[in-house]
Amino acid sequence: MSELTKEHFATNVYYDRTFDRDAAKILPGEYYYTGKDMLIVTVLGSCVSACIRDRVTGVGGMNHFMLPDGGGDADSPISASARYGTYAMEILINDLLKAGARRENLEAKVFGGGNVLSGFSSINVGERNAQFVRNFLKVENIRIVAEDLNDVHPRKVYYFPRNGKVLVKKLRQLNNNTLVNREQDYANRLQSGSVSGDVELFS
């Protein structure tokens, strides 16, 4: 794993008593993958997560990202915004392939893109993120087998890569501002920092 990859790989692994297994919690800008019978969990507002797995081997993972605002047309593959989204997707897919997944067996479930953050662009941030992840997977010929995108509610997503099961809990009321603060901090970091290095997919 390169230094660049390590910077984005989630390190918050704990034992989840509810589901009786190890779990990895991913934050905005992070991703996690595993071949073990684990749980990967995240909370999404405007960000999106792609849960991608090899349906034969059960090797799978999840990312959590948003497109930076102001990078031009998110649909243009050369915009800074699209390059960041592409990086977030490719770093996960590359690590899955390195871990033994086969490209032709990959399937995806995508979540998030809620209308939670405002003030970052004229178009809804969540909608842009949802549109990007759908388009990326279509271009890469990775089938989306389930999705829960857009809406106005944040979501807590529990992903079991070994069998592909996903549980989604809509958070109709937030008890605090942690999620919104986390996403706004992440959006600000994206604005001030440069897009991470290029990653190429291999098959």
Curated annotation (Swiss-Prot):
It catalyses: L-glutaminyl-[protein] + H2O = L-glutamyl-[protein] + NH4(+). InterPro entries: CheD-like_sf, Chemorcpt_Glu_NH3ase_CheD, Cytotoxic_necrot_fac-like_cat. It holds the Pfam family CheD. One of its GO terms (biological process) is chemotaxis. Transmembrane segments: none annotated. It comes from the Bacteria. GO terms for molecular function: protein-glutamine glutaminase activity. Keywords: Chemotaxis, Hydrolase. Its EC number is 3.5.1.44. Probably deamidates glutamine residues to glutamate on methyl-accepting chemotaxis receptors (MCPs), playing an important role in chemotaxis. Belongs to the CheD family. This is Probable chemoreceptor glutamine deamidase CheD. It comes from Janthinobacterium sp. (strain Marseille) (Minibacterium massiliensis).
